[in-house]
Amino acid sequence: MAVWLQAGALLVLLVVSSVSTNPGTPQHLCGSHLVDALYLVCGPTGFFYNPKRDVEPLLGFLPPKSAQETEVADFAFKDHAELIRKRGIVEQCCHKPCSIFELQNYCN
């Protein structure tokens, strides 16, 4: 009788814990966990990934700018660059928790 009581309590505990982990529950996903989650959510359609590349070799093709031109150019795009940085998937899902629904925004 005690075994059935323990088994019943364990079953109730499993049901309650599985209900609380629904797909909409936000989670922190970083590194390989984030990539695995994207593969799982996006499936065969894949997901958008744009790795950063080194732009130093490309800068040699441009004429040098004066200090004043550089300052004006940096100021003009500062807000836009800040917005892009804040909306990245790492900011959205690693630094803060995100849900499966938010991950779907990065699918192709």
Curated annotation (Swiss-Prot):
Residues 1-21 form the signal peptide. GO terms for molecular function: hormone activity. Disulfide bonds join 30-94, 42-107, 93-98. Keywords: Carbohydrate metabolism, Cleavage on pair of basic residues, Disulfide bond, Glucose metabolism, Hormone, Secreted, Signal. Residues 54-84 form a propeptide. One of its GO terms (biological process) is glucose metabolic process. GO terms for cellular component: extracellular space. It is found in: Secreted. Insulin decreases blood glucose concentration. It increases cell permeability to monosaccharides, amino acids and fatty acids. It accelerates glycolysis, the pentose phosphate cycle, and glycogen synthesis in liver. Heterodimer of a B chain and an A chain linked by two disulfide bonds. Belongs to the insulin family. PANTHER family: INSULIN, INSULIN/INSULIN GROWTH FACTOR. This is Insulin. It comes from Danio rerio (Zebrafish).
